């Protein structure tokens, strides 16, 4: 968790907007000196402009706020409630929280979400990994290893948000992803050479394949430091402990790089987002295949577990949007959705561990060799 505090300015300095009250902070985005009231106004107005420019909402929309109890989602709930009343958006706002099953972290943060429910007078729905997948993140990490935690959690959490929204009859979920998160994602995809994801890194509205539920980011252009300052000055109730498994995430590498760049050039966060928005990748070259390759049938049709725990299903024809996963029945553009692929890998690995531990010495080596291809 990055600790952020307002930089002290001279007592004699006046707010650069109202020129009447003393400035209490410098905006990290442009170093503008502002008083509290002007900061609130600028902060909220910029988010309103983002919402209007991107046409995120329509009157009467029922919107689920992805609530974790952290600073981003807490400020998002507070600001959306304020803007909804000020500009008469006509939205019906609901808090949607995901319980991943991380002891000592999520149980405490959910207590904060429940307080937010009362403070903001919004309905709250909690969806748990245990109920949806029969796994908790603690169990997944014990089986797949801590380095894979974010891979699993990202896929499962996105589907859990979709499922929670569908349960509530909602087709729009807003999340607290901020400008820092967007810039980090661009850097991560550049560092990994992930051109497929790089093209979509800065989309303000996203949607899972086959799902009618869209996810949007009203904080796309809002600096994390300003979100923390807003929460601090408004005295909002939020949970500040970092996820237990976050230190192992590759995102941390991009975050440290971004901090170094920001110390040299404060505008680099917006610059990176701008670059991501306007990046045009060269068109992919079409592969020329011979009739032999085209007609060649794949003889090995068994499911294979990949390094990240997902299951490869061979070269099957992809489903169209609107079809459903053959395993869980949820909307998917493939025969088996990503969540079920990951869970299948976990079940296979757990079966291997169980056999290794319980099989008698005679025959154990044969069974182990047979199932070895299923391990991560």
UniProtKB/Swiss-Prot annotation:
Instruction: Provide the E.C. number(s) assigned to this enzyme.
Output: 2.7.7.-
Which pathway is this protein engaged in?
tRNA modification; 5-methoxycarbonylmethyl-2-thiouridine-tRNA biosynthesis
User: Cross-referenced InterPro entries, in alphabetical order?
Assistant: CTU1-like_ATP-bd, CTU1_C, Ncs6/Tuc1/Ctu1, Rossmann-like_a/b/a_fold, TilS/TtcA_N, tRNA_thiolation_TtcA_Ctu1, UPF0021_CS
What keywords is this UniProt entry annotated with? Cytoplasm, RNA-binding, Transferase, tRNA processing, tRNA-binding
Fetch the CDD domains from UniProt: CTU1-like (cd01713)
Localization per Swiss-Prot or TrEMBL: Cytoplasm
Q: What class of enzyme is it?
A: transferase
Report the leader peptide range. Answer: none
Main subcellular location = cytoplasm
Entry's Gene Ontology BP terms: protein urmylation; tRNA thio-modification; tRNA wobble position uridine thiolation; tRNA wobble uridine modification
The superkingdom listed in its UniProt entry is Eukaryota
Do the record's keywords include Repeat?
no
Q: Which GO terms describe its cellular component?
A: cytosol; cytosolic tRNA wobble base thiouridylase complex; mitochondrion
A molecular function GO annotation:
nucleotidyltransferase activity
Query: Family assignment?
Result: Belongs to the TtcA family. CTU1/NCS6/ATPBD3 subfamily.
Functionally, this protein is described as follows: Plays a central role in 2-thiolation of mcm(5)S(2)U at tRNA wobble positions of tRNA(Lys), tRNA(Glu) and tRNA(Gln). Directly binds tRNAs and probably acts by catalyzing adenylation of tRNAs, an intermediate required for 2-thiolation. It is unclear whether it acts as a sulfurtransferase that transfers sulfur from thiocarboxylated URM1 onto the uridine of tRNAs at wobble position. Prior mcm(5) tRNA modification by the elongator complex is required for 2-thiolation. May also be involved in protein urmylation.
Report what the protein is called: Cytoplasmic tRNA 2-thiolation protein 1
Q: Which organism is it from?
A: Scheffersomyces stipitis (strain ATCC 58785 / CBS 6054 / NBRC 10063 / NRRL Y-11545)
Which gene produces this protein? Answer: NCS6
């Amino acid at each position: 968790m990055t600790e952020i505090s307002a930089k002290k300015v001279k007592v004699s300095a006046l707010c650069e907007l109202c020129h009447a009250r003393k400035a209490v902070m410098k905006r990290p985005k442009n170093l503008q000196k502002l008083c509290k009231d002007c900061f609130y106004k600028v902060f909220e107005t910029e988010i309103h402009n983002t919402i209007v420019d991107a046409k995120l909402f329509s009157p009467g929309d029922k919107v689920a706020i992805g609530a974790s109890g952290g600073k981003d989602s807490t400020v998002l709930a507070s600001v959306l409630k304020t803007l909804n009343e000020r500009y008469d958006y006509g939205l019906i706002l609901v808090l949607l929280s995901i319980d991943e099953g991380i002891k000592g972290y999520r149980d405490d943060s959910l207590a904060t979400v429940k307080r937010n429910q009362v403070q903001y007078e919004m309905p709250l729905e909690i969806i748990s990994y245990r109920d949806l997948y029969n796994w908790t993140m603690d169990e997944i990490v014990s089986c797949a290893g801590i380095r894979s935690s974010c891979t699993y959690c990202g896929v499962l959490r996105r589907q859990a948000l979709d499922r929670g929204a569908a349960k509530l009859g909602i087709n729009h979920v807003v999340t607290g992803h901020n400008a820092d998160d967007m810039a980090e994602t661009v850097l991560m995809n550049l560092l990994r050479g992930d051109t497929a994801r790089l093209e979509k890194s800065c989309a303000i509205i996203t949607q899972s394949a086959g799902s009618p539920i869209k996810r949007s980011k009203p904080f796309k252009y809002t600096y994390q430091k300003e979100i923390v300052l807003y929460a601090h000055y408004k005295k909002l109730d939020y949970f500040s402990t970092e996820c237990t498994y976050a230190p192992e995430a590759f995102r941390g590498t991009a975050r440290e790089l971004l901090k170094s760049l920001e110390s040299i050039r404060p505008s680099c966060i917006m610059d990176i987002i701008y670059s991501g928005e306007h990046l045009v990748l060269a068109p992919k070259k079409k592969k020329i295949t011979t009739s032999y390759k085209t007609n060649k049938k794949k003889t090995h049709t068994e499911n294979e577990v990949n390094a990240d725990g997902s299951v490869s299903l061979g070269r099957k024809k992809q489903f169209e949007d609107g079809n459903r996963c053959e395993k869980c029945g949820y909307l998917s553009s493939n025969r088996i959705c990503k969540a079920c692929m990951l869970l299948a890998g976990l079940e296979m690995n757990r079966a291997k561990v169980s056999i290794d531990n319980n099989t008698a010495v005679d025959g154990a080596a044969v069974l182990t060799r047979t199932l070895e291809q299923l391990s991560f």
